[in-house]
Amino acid sequence: MSSPTPFKMRLVHLDLKGAPPKVSYLSEVFPLFHALGANGLLIEYEDMFPYEGHLRLLRAKHAYSPSEVTEILRLARLSELEVIPLVQTFGHMEFVLKHAAFAHLREVALFPNTLNPHEAESLALVQAMIDQILELHRDVRWLHIGCDEVYYLGEGETSKQWLQQEQNSHAKLCLSHMQAVASHVLTQHPGVTPLVWDDMLRDIPQEQLKASGVPQLVEPVLWDYGADLDVHGKVFLIGKYQECGFQRLWAASAFKGATGASQALPPVEHHIRNHELWLQVAGSGPKDALQGIILTGWQRYDHFSVLCELLPVGIPSLAACLQSLVHGGFAEDVRLRAERFLGVSSLEIADTVSEGAGSFPGSDIHALVTQISLHLRSSVDTLLERNRYVTGWFSPYHRRRKLVHPVMIQHIQPEALSLLSRWNNLVQQLEVALQPVFYPDTIEEWLEENVLPSLQRLQDLLQDLGEAAARQPPPTSPGWDTGQNP
């Protein structure tokens, strides 16, 4: 018998700093999220938010309009999904600090990761961002203000001077900025409670945390995406945070985007195990210690990294993870329920994903991306590196010199043309499937990263073969000379 979930709130994270879906696709997946057991969304807009005024330059090319944000919120309400917006206010500020207009606010001049907390203009900047986001999210109960992975904090020139004073420390520097940002949220937007990622808090001594006043201002989100999550360590951390005075705590797991910056297919078994371990944490710690859990679905590791798993490709993993949370584990009956929701005949969690098509929104993308990711590069590798005619008679040595035995053209060319035709056909199908879901720049980026390098290798082989075939007279061996007399 499945046990009920210990997590009252179960939020799906939408990471919009890469491959942001069109609103029409969100209208299709929100009801599925709800059916699978989600009751909230953490929306990380990054450069997809329609910032105005001096912040307008933060907008991406295809940023949502204010009316589209309003529509997203309406669609979320229809599916009974409570929205928590997320805005980075300390680390991961690349989408802001990459711009020349804000580069002077970097903690380290060379790196756009982290905001300089000593500049009054830095605080004014994040306050303006918060105010614009909450202007369009008037009914929210929480705002996530980020504050994770604040790399290079303390390494700026102003910080180095500040840290030379005896009473100052990296922890104090971090907590003071967190306090300033959270205080702005609480004073200017009563009723909205700030959430923060917890990694910058973990190693701060208990007494210092308690004395900072931060536990009265924010609710930490304990994040761990591993399949080897330390249950006892997390239970200990929960106890530490509670003793410091934090009123509420949250957990964060991952259903995709946590196992490799260029990962194309989510390892479902890894993600299910991560959720099973979080269930153990919730069951081992104080009752109701965790307010809820955020199922993160990262789309880029940071603003400058490549895309990882696309949202439609991650939906089977999300289904398995949400159903695990709702039913207290991923027993056989839970697997069958997940398969019914997805319209798949088999959810192969031991493999990367199931290759079978489903009936969920974006299932055609899932099926095509799976085929391409599992077989495109390997099929080209097989032809170029293990086909005996290519390796024996049209090696890189031959190709550079445009040398080929005429009979080998008949052995190599038909197979290469057939392979190229097959993959071109599948890629065209994928482009058609991607167009209703994603904007053109996302499609271009995904294909250029995941498809074009392999297709280019095939095309280069065929071009070299054609040029070698056109040479007259054909050489008799790779050692064929130029015909000059000694």
UniProtKB/Swiss-Prot annotation:
Pfam family, one: Glyco_hydro_20
Catalytic reaction list: Hydrolysis of terminal non-reducing N-acetyl-D-hexosamine residues in N-acetyl-beta-D-hexosaminides
UniProt note: pH dependence: Optimum pH is 5.5.
Superkingdom to which the source organism belongs: Eukaryota
Annotated region (Disordered), positions in chain: 467-486
Reported tissue expression: Ubiquitous.
Summary of temperature dependence: Optimum temperature is 37 degrees Celsius.
Keywords: Cytoplasm, Disulfide bond, Glycosidase, Hydrolase, Nucleus
Active site: 149 (proton donor)
Single GO cellular component term: cytoplasm
GO molecular function: beta-N-acetylhexosaminidase activity; hexosaminidase activity
Matches recorded under InterPro entries: Glyco_hydro_20_cat, Glycoside_hydrolase_SF, HEXDC-like
GO biological process, one term: carbohydrate metabolic process
EC numbers on record: 3.2.1.52
Documented activity regulation: Inhibited by O-(2-acetamido-2-deoxy-D-glucopyranosylidene)amino N-phenylcarbamate (PUGNAc). Inhibited by galacto-NAG-thiazoline.
UniProt function note: Has hexosaminidase activity. Responsible for the cleavage of the monosaccharides N-acetylglucosamine (GlcNAc) and N-acetylgalactosamine (GalNAc) from cellular substrates. Has a preference for galactosaminide over glucosaminide substrates.
Family: Belongs to the glycosyl hydrolase 20 family.
Subunit annotation: Homodimer; disulfide-linked.
Listed name of the protein: Hexosaminidase D
Biological source species: Mus musculus
